[in-house]
Amino acid sequence: MSLSSHIQERLLTLDRGTGTAALKRLVLASGAEWYRDNPAERARLRDNLTAFGLPGDERMVDAAASNVMLHYYEKLLPLFCAPDAYASYLREHVSAGDALAALAEAHRAGTASLVAVSHFGAVELVTPTLALHGLPVSAVLRFTTPQLSEAAAEQARRFADSGRFAPVRFIEVGKPGVVAAMEMAAVVRRGGVLVSVFDERTEYSVPVSLLGRAVWGGAGLDRLMRLAGGRQRLCAAFMERTGDETYRLTTQEITGTDTPVQALVERLERMVRSHPEQWYFLHEEIPFVES
């Protein structure tokens, strides 16, 4: 059983009134249990760190495992919060500064924004933070279980109905009846805000260089840019963990390059070099080109 399924099986049935502190304790305890029972997964973290020339000592492996667990806490958190409570949580814990200014400007002008995110830091907080600040979002993702998919969609509707958040629509890759590429293209044509990952392999990915290794990346964002004919903004967005449930959102617009996917990956590389333990993808099988 994967870590995601292990945690969801135990926690999605909890009372929705479970407080954030209790939820966090339960996620961390469940994750620690899983890692104890699956030593090969700790070895995977170490192997992936060293494959990229990053520190692979026990302290770093412990930190990486802890950050993987926090990813699931941040993913589940909105399911256990009322809209007002989650809005207050984000306002109190997320520092956004002027990171949203360019996106807000593009939204007012009806210009499409491609918000490229990676498996780094508290990525699960990016979309709700955009929605909190009035940006309607279409988010491309995969839900590991139908139960989580249904719960997330229902909660997104509740959040939008509350007036605290702009609407969030999920484009679920691999869901029966969903042609994700066509739906992503439709968002771009409408001048919407599309949030999509760029550091994983799909049929549309291209080879890029990351930390001295050739990997697959982009997940089709370069194709969407060509479809938009330059009438869009592309930015890399990162939600860095800065402390105990404190976060900083940064966005970096990508312009003036013929290789936008490589430019995105270079932004990710800087973040990973600074905080390798926050790169969630260390938990996965890295999409090396040579493999």
Q: PLM ranges: what are they?
A:
Residues 111-174:
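Catalytic core of membrane glycerolipid acyltransferases/transacylases, capturing the structured
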Residues 106, 159-163, 228-231:
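Alpha-helix termini
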Residues 85-89, 165-172, 207-210, 253:
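Short, basic, glycine/proline-bearing loop/turn elements
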